[in-house]
Amino acid sequence: MDDLDALLADLESTTSHISKRPVFLTEETPYSYPTGNHTYQEIAVPPPVPPPPSSEALNGTVIDPLDQWQPSVSRYGHQQPQSQSPIYSSSAKSSSASVPRDGLSSPSPRASEEEHVYSFPNKQKSAEPSPTMTSTSLGSNLSELDRLLLELNAVQHNPPSGFSADEVSRSPSLPNVTGPHYVIPESSSSAGGKAAPPTKEKPKRNGGRGIEDVRPSVESLLDELESSVPSPVPAITVSQGEVSSPQRVNASQQQTRISASSATRELDELMASLSDFKFMAQGKAGGSSSPPSTTPKPGSQLDTMLGSLQSDLNKLGVATVAKGVCGACKKPIAGQVVTAMGKTWHPEHFVCTHCQEEIGSRNFFERDGQPYCEKDYHNLFSPRCYYCNGPILDKVVTALDRTWHPEHFFCAQCGVFFGPEGFHEKDGKAYCRKDYFDMFAPKCGGCARAILENYISALNTLWHPECFVCRECFTPFINGSFFEHDGQPYCEVHYHERRGSLCSGCQKPITGRCITAMGKKFHPEHFVCAFCLKQLNKGTFKEQNDKPYCQNCFLKLFC
């Protein structure tokens, strides 16, 4: 606790360097901050430019109030010792930082609301500070304040050994304070009389109060730092002697305006950094007790985000009614829901089993309890066409123990689609009726065309009935008898003619004995002399002009 007291004292001394310097803003919102033991007078008509404080005011020299101010104006006494700090109280603080003297007229209610005179710890200055040095000192003081706040946070998150965790948790929290409470002693009305300097009350620290008792004091110091840059209130004009150089006043006002705005900006950045640091420290303190988590897989990041979103909504009091349990991740569904196959799904979890693409509002197919997109289902499970080997999506033709697209089932020879008459199969291929019989049906021995209906089997060949006739005279065979010569059917006459067994005299077939002469065949009774018609049976004859003659007729006729 001694280290904490030292930090608070160092913090108070740091803010006293900032608060004792008067800051002047623009003419629209002129402010003055009295330092030292001066009494200021409100002037009804303000001058065009607020005068800078004199060196006596900055150095804390006491000026006789009777010589400086008119007696008809209400006076406010502000006296602060150099070595003492303001008194801090844990109760709610008053928004006014000045207390009117006893015996003087109190300001009107409007003046008490709009005019605030702030008193800050003052130290003697040997000379008027330059604006450059003041701005540099302000930046260094803010940096020092930032460092002290970081150390204070470290002490708050790690309580001293003298405090147990139960004491810290049971320590009562103090009410919020709106600003530091300054107790200002009343000045004596007699010239030269001064009141005794007030004593500073340090924050009480005992065993019954925890680390949270220190925080109001730190917040009071921060409020004191914020009060160095005042909020806009009606102008307060201070008359404090002659202004020797208007150019110097303008330059001083511009420099102090820059310093004031810079201090405000740095203070905002400091407060933002302090909030971020507290948030990070709480996160680290909460995460130190839990074991280190492994890096989540990319596939589970979405599930983690959904789970954290639902928990955050529950913490905020937003009731999320589950619409079901997802069939994939087995987690409740709070947003959009997909109902399919008797289950409910997250839209991003209802995906194709094969390609893992989100199905959404597209058509899908079910197989063994698993959803498939239309493309993958047909590629995996649909029958394939025997002709193109592609999946069959719509109508299917089943033939020859195979499946076909209707547009791919046609005659293998002519490419014509099969009609009502159907098709014929040969060697695993389908043919139309015409091409099948033309290619594979038995051919007629007479016309060489396919035999489609009745036929005659003869001479090891099939014949149309109308085609089985004599190959010479095309006469149908009576009683079914025919003669064959060189694999062709003939009638008896043409058969003997083809073979040469036809009598040359009577032009009838020779069925018995025959005589062969002059390259011809004759019945014995039909081989006679061409002149006398006597039978030439002795075996001797004369031939003249392809005709036979007996010996006597030949001599008579030709000798």
UniProtKB/Swiss-Prot annotation:
Region (Disordered) location: 17-139, 158-213, 225-262, 281-301
Protein's GO biological process: endothelial cell migration; response to muscle stretch; substrate adhesion-dependent cell spreading; transforming growth factor beta receptor signaling pathway
Residues found modified as Phosphotyrosine: 31, 118
SUPFAM superfamilies assigned to the protein according to its UniProt record, in alphabetical order: Glucocorticoid receptor-like (DNA-binding domain)
Motif stretch (LD motif 2): 144-156
Taxonomy, superkingdom: Eukaryota
Subcellular locations according to the entry: Cytoplasm, Cytoskeleton; Cell junction, Focal adhesion; Cytoplasm, Cell cortex
LD motif 5, short sequence motif: residues: 301-313
Compositional bias annotation for Low complexity: 79-98
Gene3D superfamilies, sorted: Cysteine Rich Protein, Nucleotidyltransferases domain 2
Motif residue range(s): LD motif 4: 266-277
Biased composition (Polar residues): 121-137, 237-262
Principal place of residence: cytoplasm
Gene Ontology terms, MF aspect: metal ion binding; vinculin binding
UniProt entry keywords in alphabetical sequence: Cell adhesion, Cell junction, Cytoplasm, Cytoskeleton, LIM domain, Metal-binding, Phosphoprotein, Repeat, Zinc
Designated name of the protein: Paxillin
